Amino acid sequence: MNKLALYCRIGFEKETAAEITEKAAEKGVFGFARVNNDSGYVIFECYQEGEADRLAREIPFNQLIFARQMIVISDLLENLPPTDRITPIIEEYNRIGSLVNLHRTTELFVETADTNEAKELSVFCRKFTVPLRQALKKQGYLAFKEVKKSGLTLHIFFVKPNCCYVGYSYNNNHSPNFMGILRLKFPPQAPSRSTLKLHEAILTFLSPEEERKCMNESMYGVDLGACPGGWTYQLVKRGLFVYAVDHGKMAASLHDTGRIDHCPEDGFKFQPPKRSKIDWLVCDMVEQPIRIAALIAKWLVNEWCRESIFNLKLPMKKRYAEVQNCLQLITNELDKAGFKYHIQAKHLYHDREEITVHISVKK
């Protein structure tokens, strides 16, 4: 097996392809990406057999920005008989099992790309999952009792009703979510749907233990470009006191909590109160990404905050290059100032033409 499938948001196939090609080359693995615009996925084909499995183990999935999921896959199974799609899939897994220990598998996902065209196909996938799972269990798969994410997940990736890729992912280096998507319900108390972006970011970048430790009633936050309060809502919900910086009005429900101080100022000019220790800076301002990157770097280097989650709105062209420029600007400034830092970026499900970045720093 020499192929990876990477799911992504439609329209971001080129960025996903550029990123996986670069990350693979850093590991000394070379190949080429098959890209169909607006397909919602990319196939990366390695020149050498076995290297796709190596990439799936060695490229840290949490360091991939645009990929929602990373799967080692077979060649495309075509012309599956409508009366028995299961047998060819089982046969393919038995073949793969001679290369990888699939008796360490714990879960099955029967998936499609996240496109409007695939919605009808996803209905079939749901119905197909139960009989396929039963057939796989009869073969001894999906019964592994996992310890510390040591198992594998089986993936069937349908591109047409009679065509699919058969594959697997490593549980310690993948998205645990179906189709790589973390779906969240909109809280009716939140002032705007943008609240889902910060909610997903917190769940993506912080473990439950880290969230409890780093976001609580003893913490202070700043939300730049806060109006009407979608991101402020997520901080207040976790007990933080928030300086909400925006010339616009904040939702009355947030004022009623007594946990915000509305500062009607320019987010680029605002500085935190001198006697306040700011733990978190969040920012979802619509602005050139390089300006936002410079602003975040200034806050971190000046030690105005210790941790930040922010969005970078991406241009229509050369988006991956722009992301690299922005992250490089921030890391260069932190390196010059002698900070240790952890940085992670992700194109979240609730993001649109943007990515979300998390940075924590310490001297």
UniProtKB/Swiss-Prot annotation:
Gene Ontology CC = cytoplasm
A biological-process GO annotation:
rRNA processing
- Disulfide bridge positions per record: none
Q: Which residues form the active site?
A: K313 (proton acceptor)
Report the EC code(s) recorded for this entry: 2.1.1.186
**Which reactions appear under catalytic activity for this entry?**
cytidine(2498) in 23S rRNA + S-adenosyl-L-methionine = 2'-O-methylcytidine(2498) in 23S rRNA + S-adenosyl-L-homocysteine + H(+)
UniProt-annotated binding residues for S-adenosyl-L-methionine? S194, C227, P228, G229, G230, D246, D266, D284
GO MF term list: S-adenosylmethionine-dependent methyltransferase activity
Entry superkingdom = Bacteria
* Keyword Transferase annotated: yes
UniProt KW keywords? Cytoplasm, Methyltransferase, rRNA processing, S-adenosyl-L-methionine, Transferase
Is rRNA processing included in the keywords of this UniProt record? yes
The cross-references to InterPro entries, in alphabetical order and at most eight, read: RlmM_FDX (IPR040739), RlmM_THUMP-like (IPR048646), RNA_MeTrfase_FtsJ_dom (IPR002877), rRNA_MeTrfase_M (IPR011224), SAM-dependent_MTases_sf (IPR029063)
Q: Where's it found, cell-wise?
A: Cytoplasm
Subunit structure, interactors included = Monomer.
The UniProt family comment states: Belongs to the class I-like SAM-binding methyltransferase superfamily. RNA methyltransferase RlmE family. RlmM subfamily.
Function according to Swiss-Prot or TrEMBL: Catalyzes the 2'-O-methylation at nucleotide C2498 in 23S rRNA.
Protein name (Swiss-Prot/TrEMBL): Ribosomal RNA large subunit methyltransferase M
Q: Which organism is it from?
A: Mannheimia succiniciproducens (strain KCTC 0769BP / MBEL55E)
